[in-house]
Amino acid sequence: METFLGIMIPFLGTALGAACVFFMKKSLGDLVQRALAGFAAGVMVAASIWSLLIPAIEQSEGMGKLSFLPAFIGFWVGVLFLLLLDHLIPHLHVGSDQAEGPKSRLGRTTMMVLAVTLHNILEGMAVGVMYAGFLAGNAQITAASALVLSLGIAIQNFPEGAIISMPLRAEGEGKGKAFFGGVLSGVVEPIGAVLTLLAAQMVIPALPYFLSFAAGAMLYVVVEELIPEMSQGKHSNIGTIFFAVGFSVMMTLDVALG
C-alpha cells in the first residue's frame, strides 16, 4: 500500500493542478507561467542530483575510482533516449509556436499535451526506480527518500496540470474537457512507475544505471523545455527566482526527510 500511494502521489499533483480550471476564470499570465516553469525546473534539478545521481554513485562505491561509471553511462543513455523521443514524437512546448519532431496534422493543444506527457513518463520512471530500490532493501534508498521524490514531483506537477488545462479552457473547451486534458497528461506517470518498478526489480544490480538514466532524462527536459519557458518574453528574473525556490524546497525535503 505504501508503494502504491507513493506511485500515485505525482499523478494526484497533476490532477489537482488541472482542477484549477474550475476555480480560475482567466488563463495563466506570462509571468505566472514563467514562475511555475522556473519552480518546476528547480525541483527537477534538485531531485536529479540528491534523489537519483548521488544514490547511483553511492551504490557503485565498490568499483573504487570507477564508481562514477554507472552513473555516467546511465545519465548519457537517459539524455540520448529523450533526444530520440524528441525526434520521433510530434510535440509543442508551452509558449512556443513552432512544433518539434516529425511533421504532423495534430492540433496545437494535442501536441502541447504530448510534450508534457513525454516528460511525465520519465518522472514516473524515476519514482518507479526509487521504489524498486526501497523494496529490494537497498541501504541508500529508504521509504522516506522514495516518498520525498514522489512529493517533489507532485509539487512541480501541480503547475503543469494548470498549464495544460487553463490554455485548453482559454481556447474554448468546456471545463470538464479541459480538466480531462490536464489529467490525461499525468496518467502516464503511474503507468511508467509500475513498468519501471517491475523492470528494475528483475535487474536490481543495474539499479545505479536506472537511477542515473532517470536523472539524465529529467535534466534533458529541464534544459530543453523548462529553462526556455522560464526565460521567454519580456526580461524578468521571476523564472530564475522561482527556480531557486523550487531547488531549495526539493533539496530541503530530500536532506531533512530522506
What is the predicted role of each segment?
Residues 1-258:
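Intrinsically disordered, metal-sensing/regulatory segments
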